Amino acid sequence: MLREIIEGYAPDCEQEVQDRRMMLTYLDLFPGDILTRANEIAHFSASAWVVNPQRDRVLMLYHNIYKSWAWPGGHADGEENLLGVALREVKEETGIERLRPVTEQLYSLEILTVNAHVKRGKYVVPHLHLNLTYLLEADDAQEVHSKPDENSAVRWFGLDEAVKASTEPEMRVVYQKLNDRLECLKGGRA
């Protein structure tokens, strides 16, 4: 299922062409543990670009490890259904109860570098997140709350404001890509 999703995805930029190629290579190299954190080189994760129905606001959280405003998301932890992972992570990390995929198709993909850090008292070596991103929609009137062991705040941002709120230059590029795609979708409303 995962291989088919990645193979079926049509990249529209060089970053995605190369990242897609490498994800497929990693699937071949690590067939047994690419979905789990047991693979300390690279493993799959899922993220969500959560927009309101008007598609002019995006839900972000202040990530405790990265010390930056970021999208919700998390590790596959053995789960091959990464859309399901993205939905679960949004609910867990933001308190949002009602949300839906704008489409079940992959919205973007990217290989993200993760620096060494300490999580729950354990040292985590530098590694790669093979990340699949899904476009989700939620009513921005819903109550949100943080998940203190992972983030310290959750709030809605205007699209441009969300990009600027990130303190990670490499993630600003990703968030801008997602916003640019959203602008293209607004005309055709999925």
State where each predicted segment sits:
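Acidic, metal-coordinating catalytic segment for phosphate/diphosphate chemistry
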Residues: 10-47
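Generic N-terminal amphipathic, Lys/Arg-enriched alpha-helix
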Residues: 1-10
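Generic L/I/V-rich hydrophobic alpha-helical segments across diverse proteins
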Residues: 6, 24, 175-178
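Unchanged
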Residues: 77-173
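Short histidine-centered beta-strand/loop micro-motifs
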Residues: 59-61, 74, 145-147
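N-terminal strand-loop-strand
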Residues: 36-71
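Charged phosphate-binding loop/patch that engages nucleotide di/tri-phosphates or the phosphate backbone
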Residues: 166-190
